[in-house]
Design a protein with these regions (language model features):
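Conserved beta-propeller blade repeats
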Residues: 2-23, 49-71, 99-118, 151-168, ...
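Beta-propeller blade-edge and WD-like acidic-aromatic loop motif
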Residues: 1, 26-52, 68-70, 74-94, ...
Length: 191
C-alpha cells in the first residue's frame, strides 16, 4: 500500500525522549480513503530506527521515560485503548481496558505512574479530563477530574481539544476549552 500511485505520506506527533537521545514519530500514509499509521522510534542521529507499532491505528503518544511510551491505538490483539509499550520491543500492556476512546495522555512530573488524558466530545457534547495509574490493568484507578461542554459551533477544523498538561509540581492540570463560548485556558487543581 505504501508505494501505490497516489499515496500521500506524512509524519507528525514528533516527540523527544526525556533524555533527548531518541524520538518518536507517527508515520502516516493515505491511499484512497484508507489511512495507515506506524509508531516509529529512532536515535536522534537517525540510527537504530524501530517500528514500535504497526497495528490498525496509532494516535496520541507520550514518553513515560526513556524506554516506555503510552499510546492510544487499536491493536489487532487487544482492540482500541491505551497501551504502555517498551521501546525497541514488541512488549506492551493494555491499561484501563474499559476505555476505548482516543485522548491526549501525559505523565505527571512528580508521579511516574500517574497519567492525565482527555476525551473527545460525547454525543451530548461533553468532554472529560481523567487521571489514572498506568499500572492499572483493570481500570479501578481512573477518576474524572472535569467535565466541560463543547458547543457545536466549535467542530471539525475549529474544534478545541482539551490537551491536558501538568503543572511542574504535579498539583494542577491546565487545559484548553471553549465551554464559556470562547477559547480559554483553564486550571483544575489535583487533591
Amino acid at each position: 500500500e505504501m508505494q501505490e500511485e497516489g499515496s500521500v505520506h506524512k509524519v507528525n506527533h514528533l516527540m523527544l525522549s526525556p533524555n533527548g537521545k531518541r524520538f518518536m514519530v507517527l508515520y502516516r500514509w493515505f491511499c484512497g480513503q484508507r489511512k495507515y499509521t506506524r509508531l516509529i522510534t529512532c536515535n536522534i542521529d537517525g540510527t537504530d530506527m524501530y517500528v514500535l507499532s504497526d497495528d490498525d491505528m496509532v494516535s496520541h503518544c507520550y514518553w513515560k521515560n526513556d524506554e516506555e511510551i503510552i499510546a492510544f491505538e487499536r491493536k489487532k490483539d487487544g482492540g482500541p485503548g491505551y497501551y504502555l509499550m517498551k521501546d525497541k520491543t514488541q512488549g506492551w500492556t493494555h491499561v484501563w481496558p474499559q476505555l476505548s476512546n482516543d485522548g491526549h495522555p501525559s505523565y505527571c512530573p512528580t508521579n511516574n505512574n500517574l497519567v492525565v488524558f482527555d476525551t473527545y466530545p460525547s454525543r451530548s457534547r461533553i468532554q472529560e479530563i481523567k487521571i489514572g495509574l498506568d499500572n492499572d490493568t483493570v481500570g479501578d484507578s481512573v477518576k474524572v477530574l472535569a467535565r466541560v461542554f463543547s458547543p457545536f459551533k466549535y467542530d471539525n477544523d475549529t474544534r478545541c481539544d482539551l490537551h491536558p498538561r501538568w503543572r511542574q509540581d504535579g498539583k494542577a492540570i491546565c487545559f484548553d476549552s471553549i465551554f464559556e463560548g470562547h477559547r480559554g485556558l483553564y486550571i483544575v487543581n489535583i487533591d
